[in-house]
């Protein structure tokens, strides 16, 4: 499928939005602002607090930093996808980079929360094991989280194509070549499949872990 690189001036895109579209942008903006506020406050509290152990402090800082960056990137992504005719016109590399960084950060956040949930189960069920859980092990877990998040979405950065989506407007989206079988169902359908495969499994582990506790 060839990408149609249009240079025509767009109409007022906001005029074409439905009420649901405007609600979507409003909700994203609200969550982004709250995310920046709460995660910045959390980082400040963790750094100043003395009641946190070294291990949990590192984990909470890691999650808060990831979520803070996500909160900053979110409004940028929404603005590019909602208020421009085409995101990154004639620049496929930037389109891929934005998509790759966004998905990597979201997945790193989820994996970090999954790691904490598993650690809590181990602490409750195997307390003697957790006593040997030193700082070096925490750093290894954090490194594993980041490496996994970086590698699992590497196909977006390397082996993907840039296609137009009719989601809100003719914004560009990056679709891994392996997923072209459903590329015609861009936006909602593609995201639903990716989230089901990549995100529901860690979420299920978190649910089971806290259920055991």
Residue spans for each PLM region:
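Generic alpha-helical transmembrane segments of integral inner-membrane proteins
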Residues: 33, 37-40, 72, 108, ...
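Hydrophobic alpha-helical transmembrane segments of polytopic
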Residues: 24, 31, 63, 138-145
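Transmembrane helix-loop junctions and nearby membrane-interface residues
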Residues: 43-46, 75-85, 121, 153-164, ...
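Loop architecture of class A 7-transmembrane GPCRs
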Residues: 6-14, 85-104, 151-200
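Extracellular N-terminal segment of 7TM GPCRs
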Residues: 1-41, 180
């Amino acid at each position: 499928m060839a990408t149609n690189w249009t240079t025509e001036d767009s109409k007022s895109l906001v005029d074409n939005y439905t009420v649901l579209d405007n609600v979507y942008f409003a909700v994203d903006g609200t969550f982004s602002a709250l995310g920046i506020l709460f995660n910045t406050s959390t980082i400040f509290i963790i750094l100043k607090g003395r009641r946190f152990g070294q291990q949990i402090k590192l984990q909470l800082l890691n999650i808060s930093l990831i979520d803070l960056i996500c909160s900053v990137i979110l409004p940028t992504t929404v603005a590019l996808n909602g208020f421009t005719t085409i995101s990154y016109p004639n620049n496929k590399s930037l389109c891929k980079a934005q998509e790759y960084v966004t998905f990597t950060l979201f997945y790193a956040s989820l994996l970090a929360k999954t790691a904490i949930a598993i650690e809590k189960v181990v602490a409750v069920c195997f307390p003697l094991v957790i006593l040997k859980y030193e700082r070096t092990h925490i750093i290894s877990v954090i490194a594993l989280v980041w490496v996994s998040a970086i590698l699992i979405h590497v196909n977006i950065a390397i082996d993907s194509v840039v296609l137009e989506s009719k989601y809100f407007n003719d914004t560009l989206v990056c679709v891994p070549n392996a997923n072209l079988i459903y590329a015609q169902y861009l936006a909602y359908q593609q995201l639903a499949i990716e989230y089901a495969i990549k995100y529901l499994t860690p979420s299920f582990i978190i649910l089971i872990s806290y259920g055991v506790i």
